[in-house]
Structure formats: C-alpha cells, structure tokens
A protein has these predicted regions:
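AMP-forming adenylation/ATP pyrophosphatase catalytic core
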Residues: 1-107
Length: 107
C-alpha cells in the first residue's frame, strides 16, 4: 500500500508508532533501556563493545557514549541498518557476551 518497505523507527510512550521508509534505515547509534552487564559491573561511558541487534548479524563495533540508571547510549563506528525499538541489543567482547539491553531509540 505504501510502495516501499517500512520499518518501526520509534514507539512513543503513548503507544503511537513512528514509521520510516526504506533508505532512511541507517543509524549512527542506539539508546538502550534496562541495560546491564552480565557480571553485574556497571556499563561505563568510553567502553568499547561489539553489539548485535540480530542473532545472525556480525557484531558492530561501538562506543558507550553515555550510561546512567540503566539507560545506555551506544555510538556505532559505522552506521547500522534498521535497529528497531523493542529489539534486544547484546554487547560482546570478542566472543564473550558482556551484557545488553532493549533498544528504545535510534540515533
């Protein structure tokens, strides 16, 4: 009906869904909620990880830009295609899972 692929860009607090058209699906970063490390240590600004937003995707290199109260902002080294709100983001150090969170916003 729209003539082009659409994807969820943002889910607003009131439940409204913001869509975006194909071609606008590359993002330079994501914000996670309920973010935590598997070992219980805090996620700190400046740390580097690989992050996967799809289980079969290669991990994308990123830097923690900000981390506070379970909210973590990650900035990708290279823009990434179509992360979406509600998806899990898993943080890696090489092959080791270090933590993760739920995507709430794309940057």
């Amino acid at each position: 009906a729209y003539g082009t692929p659409l994807f969820v860009r943002r889910i607003r607090p009131n439940g409204d869904v913001e869509l975006a058209r194909g071609g606008d699906e590359f993002f330079s970063g994501i914000v996670l909620t309920d973010a935590a490390r598997a070992d219980g240590r805090p996620i700190l600004a400046g740390e580097r990880y690989g992050v996967k937003v799809r289980s079969r995707a290669a991990a994308a290199s990123c830097t923690v830009e900000a981390a506070e109260n379970g909210s973590v902002t990650l900035r990708f080294d290279e823009p990434q295609r179509a992360p979406a709100p509600g998806q899990a983001a898993v943080l890696y150090d090489g092959e080791l899972v270090r933590g993760g969170g739920t995507i709430c916003e794309m940057l």
